[in-house]
Amino acid sequence: MQIGEGTTLVADASVKGLPDIRKTRFDLSVPRLRSTARAVDELALGIAGRKLSDKLVGVLGNSGQIDLNARFRGLLSSFDMQLGAATGVGNVSCNLKMAPVKGGLSSVRGDVETRNLRLGELLDRRDLLGNATLTAYVDGVIGRGVADANVVGNVTQLGFNGYVYDSLRLDGRLRNREFDGRITARDPNLDFDFFGTVDLNDSVPRYDFTMDLRHADLARLHVNRRDSVSQLSGRIVAAAGGRSLDDLNGRIQVTDARYRYNDKEIAAASMTVTGENSERSKFVELRSDFADVTFRSKTSYRTVFEYLRRSAWKYLPMLGGEKWEETPSERKAAVANDFSLLSVNIRNFNPVADAVSTGLQIADGSSLQLLFNPASDQLSLKAASEYIERRRM
């Protein structure tokens, strides 16, 4: 059967139970459905009365010619379905079983598999994404605004940022937008175990997890393109929530961290970041083997950072850059009676300084106190150090 221009359908259907659609049993076999993005868009307009979104049409267009095969057996509320898709960028297969359960919910069980799916071409991100080969299994319930399922995923190939990852696995429970479970990597250049919860259901995301990072080769993963050797390990424990610094509340601790770069190494027994933030009060603190940093304010971090940037250009014009003009909305965002305080105390910081800028040295015991008010443009700086040098200059 030819449907419009560009769509070919071969199908065999059996329907029993009409006119009661709830009790009607379908047995539908589609050995072949061939179409294109343009044809699918026109078909959607003819059937549903509206076109597909531009984004979806773009993705379908990137996939080239689409060949589908499908089998559907059962009621609309209880069925078995198999679906296969062959496209110009790779193949996808899916199996799905659905049946009603108590409380208006439906059980869902299924799997999906891709082999050498060229994600970069499909999503038009060839600069970032490569091929993907993966399998995923789902077993749970959906309905009445609820999605609750156990999910298992295995990635044997994933091209990202010019590197091909393998041996990635996800195993956990997905409740709407909350994941609780385990993620592991056994790639030659990325080896970690993640246990815990990431909850995106509320307006403020919540994190409660432990991550054992045994090995990450940042150079081979193309995360660090500056150093030929760049390897990281450590243990991360996070119990916090927040979308940004302005609403970060909780604690993030890194222990037994080691960073090896070129022929040098940095080790840290403990680093802890604590945040206590609301609309009226800002507090963030870093405690580490290298430095202690405390910041207190009533003004948003964004306003503070923009003010410091403008002040740096004003008082240190040698830094260059474009002239920054404060807008009325930014002046309004600053709290009139607030003096923000940044305190930094340094000890054994040279290994970190050298990693940031080769040859940079800062004396132990160096300190900095910065007191400022963006609303009144008042700034006071107090710094003390026996020496700060870079390559003996």
Identify the meaning behind each predicted range.
Residues 1-393:
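Interface amphipathic segments
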